[in-house]
C-alpha cells in the first residue's frame, strides 16, 4: 500500500516572543470537522460511521508530531523521522487529528494513570499549567461521575495560534486557540480563568 500524502492542513505561524520579535516557523494542524476528512483520505465522512485509524507521519527531525494516539515507533530516515502511531479506537473520521510543529509541553497523570499533556509555543510552558490542572481535575471528575474510565492512554491539549473555531474535541488530542489555553493564573482576571476552564 502506498502512503497517503496528506494535504489538508491549517498553516500556523509559530512565534517566539522571548526575543521581543516574532520569528515565524511553519506548523500545521488538521481540522476535519464537519466533513473535511474526505479531502484527506477516502472515507464515509459521516459521524455515525466509525473506523480504526493507523497513522504514519514523516517530518523533519526538528518537528514534533502529535496525533490522537501515542507514538508507537520512530524511525530516522536521512534528515527526517517517521512516527508511527498506535491504532486508534473506533471513531468518526472528523475526529482524526495531526498537529506538526515546535512546542514545549508539560504533563501529569490522572488518578487512572491517563497521561495528560499541554503543548504550548516555546517559552510558554508555565502559562499552560492552569489548563493542565483543569484538564486533570475534569478528567478525574467525569471518570467518577460516569463510572467509566476514559478509554484512551493519553489526552493532549495543543495551543494553536490560528484556528477557525475556539476549540476542537478531537479524541485524545484537543486543539484550542492559544488565547483559550495559555494564561498566567497570577495575572489573569477571574473571567479569563473561567473561560479557560470551560474550554
Region spans (language model):
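Hydrophobic helix-coil surface modules that form long, contiguous segments used
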Residues: 30-37, 42-198
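A surface-exposed beta-strand-loop module
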Residues: 1-24
Amino acid at each position: 500500500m502506498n502512503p497517503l500524502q496528506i494535504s489538508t492542513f491549517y498553516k500556523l505561524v509559530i512565534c517566539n516572543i522571548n526575543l521581543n520579535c516574532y520569528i515565524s516557523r511553519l506548523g500545521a494542524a488538521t481540522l476535519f470537522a464537519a466533513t473535511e476528512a474526505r479531502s484527506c483520505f477516502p472515507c464515509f465522512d459521516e459521524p455515525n460511521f466509525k473506523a480504526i485509524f493507523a497513522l504514519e507521519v514523516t517530518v523533519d527531525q526538528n518537528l514534533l508530531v502529535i496525533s490522537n494516539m501515542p507514538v508507537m515507533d520512530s524511525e530516522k530516515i536521512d534528515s527526517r523521522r517517521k512516527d508511527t502511531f498506535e491504532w486508534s479506537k473506533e471513531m468518526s473520521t472528523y475526529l482524526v487529528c495531526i498537529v506538526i510543529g515546535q512546542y514545549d509541553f508539560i504533563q501529569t497523570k490522572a488518578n487512572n494513570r491517563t497521561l495528560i499533556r499541554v503543548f504550548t509555543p516555546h517559552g510558554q510552558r508555565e502559562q499552560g499549567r492552569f489548563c493542565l490542572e483543569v484538564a486533570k481535575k475534569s478528567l478525574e471528575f467525569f471518570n467518577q461521575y460516569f463510572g467509566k474510565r476514559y478509554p484512551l492512554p493519553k489526552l493532549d491539549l495543543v495551543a494553536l495560534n490560528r484556528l477557525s473555531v475556539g476549540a476542537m474535541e478531537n479524541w485524545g488530542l484537543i486543539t484550542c486557540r492559544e488565547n483559550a489555553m495559555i494564561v498566567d493564573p497570577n495575572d489573569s482576571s477571574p473571567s479569563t480563568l473561567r473561560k479557560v476552564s470551560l474550554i
